Amino acid sequence: MSGKLRLYKEKLEGYNRFYSIVKTIKMVTLAKYRAAQGRIRTRDFSLRYTELAFSKPQASRDAVAAAKNALVYIPITTNRGSCGALNSNIVRCIDSVVSSKMVLMPVGKRGIDSFSKLYPDEFRYGIINDMKESMHFGYATFVIENAYEVSKDADRYQVIFNRFVSAGVQRNAVYNIPSYEKWKEDLADAASSDNQKNRYLFANALQNEEEQLIRDFFDFHAALAVLNAVGENELSEQAARLVAVEGQLTNISSLQQRTSSLYNKTRQFGITAALIEILSAMSSLEGNAMKGVRRNKFWEGAVTK
């Protein structure tokens, strides 16, 4: 009995320590989640002009199918564990668009480990972020510049990431960034025809500027799209991690309650058994006293009255 009681007690102490550790992780994750949520709050305002520049930030199936040159895919993955199925969803998204034109440049350690084994021919190299600092414009510029270097004659650059919808829902999203030459052709078409009426004034105003300014404008909004993608993925990561940690706390609480119940029942059973033995001994002593059993000295035999 004492061995089983000691086992339950050690288990309960271990669960209590584990619960305190996971609760601390939850508080840290919640703070990071709120910080990332504040940074991504301006996404609808900042992407308004990026959408106008690229017409459609989301991937266009027709444009991708009509591409003659390479298509650079930039899947953004997470480095941390306990983030749900974020990385698996990114891998499934890449599986659905595999083609002979695909070139991979993943972002994140787990993405590099996975895609270098799954698609060794399409994989070029990846970018690792230690995630010690929040996502910033300089990092996004570094990502898009390396994407240009991976395939200089690529038609399009597809940034695949997890878009934050709510704390419990994250969905795959794609930003479709054309090459500079393709973008200029599309800009000229928008400025000279009525095919894109919503971009007519914008295209004409930009066409009147110098070539270097147009190039800087393109690079700025391409980096801004990447910045939004990595920021969204960071927020989705913290949200998924928060939900996973909450599930861990629920599981640990149920284990604590179950072990505490077993510990209390075992302890109660041991106390009850000890009380029964004491009461039995007292009853037998009282019975002997009533029969007149007397012993003057402990080494002498009992003498009956």
Curated annotation (Swiss-Prot):
Database matches in PANTHER family: ATP SYNTHASE GAMMA CHAIN, ATP SYNTHASE SUBUNIT GAMMA, MITOCHONDRIAL
Subcellular location: Mitochondrion; Mitochondrion inner membrane
Assembly and binders: F-type ATPases have 2 components, F(1) - the catalytic core - and F(o) - the membrane proton channel. F(1) has five subunits: alpha(3), beta(3), gamma(1), delta(1), epsilon(1), plus the additional subunit P18 (Tb427.05.1710) that is not present in F(1)F(o) ATP synthase from metazoa. Subunit P18 (Tb927.5.1710) interacts with the alpha subunit with a 1:1 stoichiometry; the interaction is direct. Subunit gamma is part of the central stalk. F(o) has three main subunits: a, b and c.
Taxonomic classification: Eukaryota, Discoba, Euglenozoa, Kinetoplastea, Metakinetoplastina
Membrane topology (UniProt): Peripheral membrane protein
Gene Ontology CC terms: mitochondrial inner membrane; proton-transporting ATP synthase complex
Gene3D superfamilies: 3.40.1380.10, ATP synthase, gamma subunit, helix hairpin domain
SUPFAM superfamilies reported for this sequence: ATP synthase (F1-ATPase), gamma subunit
Function according to Swiss-Prot or TrEMBL: Mitochondrial membrane ATP synthase (F(1)F(o) ATP synthase) produces ATP from ADP in the presence of a proton gradient across the membrane which is generated by electron transport complexes of the respiratory chain. F-type ATPases consist of two structural domains, F(1) - containing the extramembraneous catalytic core, and F(o) - containing the membrane proton channel, linked together by a central stalk and a peripheral stalk. During catalysis, ATP synthesis in the catalytic domain of F(1) is coupled via a rotary mechanism of the central stalk subunits to proton translocation.
InterPro entries membership: ATP_synth_F1_ATPase_gsu (IPR035968), ATP_synth_F1_gsu (IPR000131)
Name of protein: ATP synthase subunit gamma, mitochondrial
Gene it is expressed from: ATPF1G
Pfam families named among the record's database cross-references: ATP-synt
Family from the record: Belongs to the ATPase gamma chain family.
Molecular function via GO: hydrolase activity; proton-transporting ATP synthase activity, rotational mechanism
Keywords: ATP synthesis, CF(1), Hydrogen ion transport, Hydrolase, Ion transport, Membrane, Mitochondrion, Mitochondrion inner membrane, Transport
Entry-linked CDD domains: F1-ATPase_gamma (cd12151)
Primary location: mitochondrion
